[in-house]
């Protein structure tokens, strides 16, 4: 009986604390949303293009051009990214890139082809959902990884192809914070492409890093050797080397 009471108390406390985050309004936190309707995410500046109606639902990104999806100063955190494009063939999803810059750095922390970043390796879309990414209808790209920044953030969409992109739809949800939390960490991603691997030689998925951090995951796209066409090609182990 005592165990049951303790269990109920723990569950009740968990539910109560979880729901407390919903109704609690953190002091100094301001939620914002950027899109083509409101590129700056500033308060009171949305729905200006067409007298309050939808007037700027999408943007055009010409071949070789880029577009800033978010540019903010001060501490904050990106909470969610959604976007879709009119051309989702493998060639275009590899040629379109997304870049993230933190704290006014000129070097991006993320510079990855669009399809690969959103969990579609080999730039082939498929329906899927996990805790960080989803593509429920094979036509939209969602990311809900929290991405804090101390002094500023910029997200850039780049069209490196030789084709014009007629439609880019997007929105980015973020929160302006009163100050930086020392327990926060920056989001980084690395993308690699190799035409072949060597038999008996370990392939490095993530280059050696130093400092404190957390590994969130990896998305792999593989063209199997035709020699393994009728058998399982994935033998071997994933090896992690942590703290030396």
Enumerate the predicted regions with their spans:
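Beta-strand-centric surfaces of beta-sandwich/beta-rich domains
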Residues: 21-244
């Amino acid at each position: 009986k005592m165990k049951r009471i303790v269990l109920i108390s723990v569950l009740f406390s968990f539910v109560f604390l979880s729901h407390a985050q919903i109704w609690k309004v953190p002091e100094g936190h301001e939620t914002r949303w950027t899109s083509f309707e409101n590129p700056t995410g500033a308060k009171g500046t949305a729905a200006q293009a067409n007298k309050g109606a939808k007037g700027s639902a999408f943007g055009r990104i010409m071949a070789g051009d880029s577009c800033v999806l978010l540019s903010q100063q001060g501490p904050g955190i990106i909470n969610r990214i959604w976007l879709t494009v009119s051309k989702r063939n493998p060639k275009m999803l590899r040629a379109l890139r997304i870049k993230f810059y933190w704290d006014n750095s000129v070097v991006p922390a993320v510079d990855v082809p669009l399809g690969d970043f959103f969990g579609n390796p080999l730039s082939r879309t498929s329906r899927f959902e996990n805790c960080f990414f989803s593509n429920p209808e094979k036509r939209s790209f969602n990311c809900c990884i929290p991405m804090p920044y101390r002094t500023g953030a910029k997200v850039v969409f780049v069209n490196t192809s030789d084709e014009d992109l007629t439609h880019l739809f997007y929105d980015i949800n973020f929160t302006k914070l009163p100050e930086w939390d020392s327990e926060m960490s920056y989001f980084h991603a690395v993308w690699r492409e190799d035409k072949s691997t060597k038999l008996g030689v370990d392939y490095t998925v993530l280059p050696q890093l130093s400092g404190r951090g957390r590994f969130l995951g990896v998305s792999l796209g593989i063209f199997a050797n035709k020699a393994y066409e009728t058998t399982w090609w994935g033998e071997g182990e994933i090896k992690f080397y942590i703290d030396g």
